[in-house]
Amino acid sequence: MVSPAQIAGHVFDPDDPGKRFVVELLIDGVPVGIARANLRNADLLRDEPNYRDGDFCHGFVFSIDPATHGVARQIEVRLANRGDVLAPPLLAPALDSGLAPLGGSANRDGAVRWLGGLRFNGWLAPAAGDESRIRALVDGQIVAEALASHWVQFGDCGETTRARGFDLSLPDHFADGRARQAQILDDHERELPGSPCAFVAFEDGLARFIDKHASLQRQTPRAKLFDRRAPQSLPFSMFAQWRDRFPDARLPPQDAPPPKVAVALIGERGIEASVASLEAQEVCDWVAAVLEGGGGETAFHNESLREFLDGDAKDCELVAFAPCGAVFQPTALAQLARALSRFPAAPGVYGDFTLAGEGGEWPVALSAFGYERMLEQGAGALLFALPTPVARAAVAGGAENLFRLFNFSQDGRPAPKAGPSSAPAATPVHQPGFLARLPRLDVAAATRALTEANRAHFSARRIRVEMAPGSGALFPAVRVRRPAPRGKVSVLIPTRDRVDLLEPCLEALFATADLALHEVIVLDNDSTDPETLAYFARLVQSGVRVIRVGGPFNFAKIINKGASIAVGHYLLLLNNDVEALEAGWLDEMLGRIAEPDVGAVGATLLWPGGVVQHGGVVLGPSFAAGHAFNERIDGDPGYADLLCATHEVSAVTAACLLTNRRLFLELGGFDSVHFPVNFNDVDYCLKLRAKGLRIVQSVHAKLLHRESASRGLDRRADQKDRFARELDHLRAIWGAVLCADPYYNPALSLDDFPFSALAWPPRPLQARQNVSPPPRPMPPGF
């Protein structure tokens, strides 16, 4: 018997009616409940032809958590400890609960779900006020509160709503390995759909818990998978507690101590705090100087640095740079030095840091090196170290601020006309871990300094660019415009019927981009709607190519067909539910792909309600791939100003993706076997990355995306099975990079909302360069 709230049944042995069985309930293969089948169930058992001479006490009942509805794929009941399935698995939609998962259209009274560990998130009804609060109760006691402080978008198929979202974490004393339930209430004492939520958390994750118990260590691989699927996290506001629990790693013993480090502090304020922290350095010898005269925290007189390098620092192998007022962690200099010793050919090393603020310290966890973010934000240039020969060369080249010192090593990058075969420039090393607390910047002064540094850098590369100040909140922001390269663009737009989407998509495309030299190809996947077919006829008369691609919906196959008949130098993949918002977006994307080492460019996509739908793809959340900044509204600077600066990512969505057609065909296009609908774009981008090419996410190309309005979300049983199968393929082929995205920091959480919390515990904070592993070959049929 099945209902939205319960699953009931009975189990007996015809040869031994007095025997009682224990059964367990599994959701998506994970045991979530256990019961003894001893309830009286006479009415049903009388109809069993094989039942006789018993007391009818063989029944069981399981209650179903409402949070399961719309999220679980299948539910089944088995004999405990034996694995015998009592009945065919139930598909969760058969429960007919009327609820939908986060992002669905049914939960208009709000929703909540457990993200893993002690973290929950969700939204309130759209009518909720700006100061609405959420409360969490465990065993009837209020244990946590949170303000609904950000935005989310829910709904699909063209009907979307913006609502207040919340993020809530329970106190850490609940991380004791015990399974519990939390009730989540709004400020009207109403329980949100999805509540109560079952949760379990461990002090340092399940894998570390098992490592402490010898009898359980055979379960370590499963525990690691659990930690990836249900990762634990801690809010940024609790950084002090996080650091106390996970202090920066002690330096491993080495035969030789690190070299003496010269430290150049830029500016005038806070020198006492900086010197005190240098005097507390462990292992590493140092000498320091304060460089003034340039104005602000990033500029200095060139001659003053030259004198320091020729004088007190002449015997140092390494020169570290930071704004005056930086407070270094005790092992900061040694960690920078040893990171460079691991990568002796690298031109420098930079580290993560915290920013001082009224609410304490706020962690800035950086990615591995990204050229675009260096240009538009100066990322890496506030806490870094250079080999002394590199520092001397930069000074000889006229460097007068931190940004020019840092970007000097990239002057040798190949010019756009050099072609993709040119050797790439060596890139700096990233040392994760928060090595220092930095003072807040004068953003306007830093933006001017970054502009000057970029001007010198592009002059050295002999590239003509235009630059304009951006609107950074914490860091400098400079928009860099490269000339759009010559070459035809083939715009590929798959569709099936839905003229209501396709027509505004094309109207916006023609209104915002000069397509006289380009071609537009509509890929028709078996449309039958008369209005759509009539529209196709009008498109053909206007010069648009309409190509029929028949058969079941296979996005990868459709795109591959379009690429095979396209004649453009570039391919622009564009969903039929995407609408351009303003002119210049295509030239922006073309300017980025002009660099010879760029393989693909993606745009920032917004839902109709103004919430960010796509800000790049992050690898690893829930051991999968997810969109960044889904909880941010347009105009929000994003974590560490990432929505203010174009930057690199491991992948971008094919809803709006620009790539070189020759590259696309060389790599075999999209994989239509393993990724017919989902993750084909991620797989393609990772193949580009494995070739040493960069994937750029532009914040200056913004388009509207009515996500899945055309084909709908994957909710049917067959669609969910397909999604699960494609996700299994992604994990099998690209598991190594899913565990270590170079554009994501090991100190950040891996739950479903990237850049929103700290990982508990952090992943290994090892020095790294920006490399991507090759795919793992997978035999057919696996």
Label each PLM-derived region with a short phrase:
Residues M1-P258, A280, V499, E503, ...:
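Basic, ligand-binding patches in group-transfer machinery
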Residues L91-N107, P193-V261, I266, S274, ...:
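Non-catalytic membrane-proximal stalk/linker segments that position and tether the catalytic domains
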Residues E297-D312, V549-A566:
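Glycine-rich, basic loop-to-helix element that forms the pyrophosphate-binding segment
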Residues T331-P363, A426, V578-F623:
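Conserved donor NDP-sugar-binding/catalytic core segment of glycosyltransferases
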Residues V390, G398-F434, L438, W585-M589, ...:
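A short, conserved alpha-helix in the catalytic core of glycosyltransferases
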Residues W362-A391, A556-K557, S564, G620-R662:
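A recurrent flexible, glycine/aromatic-enriched loop bordering the glycosyltransferase active site
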Residues D255-P257, V275-D285, R342, E507-L517:
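Short, acidic, metal-binding catalytic loop of nucleotide-sugar glycosyltransferases
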Residues V319, L571:
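Short aromatic/hydrophobic "clamp" motif used to bind/position activated sugar donors
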